[in-house]
Amino acid sequence: SLLQERLHEAVHRADAEAGALALLYLDLDRFKEINDGCGHGVGDQVLQALGARLGRALQPGELLARMGGDEFMLLVPRAGSETAMARGRALVEAISEPLGVSGRSFSLGASCGISLYPSDALDGAELMKHADIAMYEAKAVRGAVRLYSREVGTSLNRRLLLADRLKLALAERRLRLHYQPQIRLAD
């Protein structure tokens, strides 16, 4: 994809210049409700209007790409954590402004995860993965902007491993239910 090509180029440029870059992963809140309630045609119009709004909010050198459905990624060259957080907050705010489409007003929200190169990742693929992890952390709060941290990545991996182990234990009937009454000592 174009984003992957540009991300690859930006990583090489950052290496050559001893610089940095940020990748922002945006996921829309409440878009499914619009699609389900108003139809995919209106949903597509909302995405087009939002894409135009975000396009106007871009700064020189930035690249915005729709990843599918209601997800977007923004590549911000020569950006550290402060710049990336400011861009993330600005985009979440721009998305939250009501959109007029087909004579109706639609309110969306967004959650934003951010990964930084080279501090969070060794290459573009890892940068995308870490931005995705940070976005899911932000989505837990809705409307939040979160930087990737190794602790969040480790915590997510532990939760996924635990969920897999629980599914396996259920499938193999290794879990048993025990009734354990709880009483207060004061009673």
Predicted features and spans:
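Cyclic nucleotide signaling catalytic output domains
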Residues: 64, 90, 94, 100, ...
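Active-site core of bacterial EAL-family cyclic-dinucleotide phosphodiesterase domains
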Residues: 158-187
